[in-house]
Amino acid sequence: AAAAAGLRGAAAHGYLYGPRARNFVAAEDGVWWQSPDDPTVYPQKESCPHCVNQYRAPGYCGLTQDGSKEYTVPLDSRGAPIESPPLQATLTAGEPTTIGFKLTAHHKGHVELGVCCDAQPSQACFDRNPLTFQQDLLYGAPVDAAHPERGYVAPRAMGNPNIGDGQSPGGMGTGEYGNAMDFRMKFRLPAGVSGDRCLIQWRYITGNSCEMPGYDQVAWPSQAWRNAGVGTCALPLSADGSGAPERFWNCADVKVLPAGS
C-alpha cells in the first residue's frame, strides 16, 4: 500500500483506480529507493496520486502539481523512462467496461474518457476515440444525449458527505488519501479501436469555477448537483489545463481486443 506521508492538506482532487492509472500504480507499487544491484523495474514512488492536474504539451497523461513527474513518460525508481509500463486490464472494443475512480475533493462537474492505441499517442487520438457513458452504478447519474461522453459527478451528499471541497483545510480528512467519494461508471469503448498496448485517458473536468455548456439542461437529482451562477466556461479550454475549469488527467495502460473477440 502507498504511504500517506505528505498528503494532508495537498491541493488534490482524484484518481483513476480501475483500471489503475500510471500515477496510482506508482503510488501502490513504486519504491523510494532500491539497491543498484536489483534488476527489478519499479516505478518511481508517487506520494500524491490524486494531484495530477496539468500536462506539458505534447503530454497527455498528467503532470504533478510540483512539476516533478510527467506521467506521459513514467519513470522507474532510478529515474529512467519505463518503456512498457505493465498492462492493467484487457478490454474489448465496442463493449462496456466498468471505470472506477475516487474524488478526494468534490468540485462537481463530470468525467470523460478516451482511448488511443497509436504507437505514438496524442491528445488528438484520445479526442477522436471517446468512450460513451452508459450507466452510473452507484448514484444513478443520467445519460446526457447531447453529451454522450460525459459521466456526471453525483452530489457529495449522495456518497460521502464528509469529503472536502478542496479549499477548506479539513477537506482531506483521514485515511490513506484522505476522505474520498467512490465512483463506478460503465463506459462503452469505441468499436474500431484495438491494440496490444493502448492507453485509457481519464479526465475530470470540475464544475465549481465555471460550468461547461449543457450543465443547465441536466436536472438530476435536481439542479443542486451543479454550481449554478458561476457562469459558463470559455471555449475552447486551454490545452495544458491552465485556467478555469480546473482539470485532472490520468492514463491507464490496457490491451484492447478487436470487437467480437
Regions picked out by a protein language model, each given a short descriptive name:
Residues 1-2, 38:
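Helix-centric, low-specificity signal for extended rod-like, repetitive segments
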Residues 13-260:
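Structured recognition/catalytic domains enriched at protein termini
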Residues 2-18:
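N-terminal signal peptide
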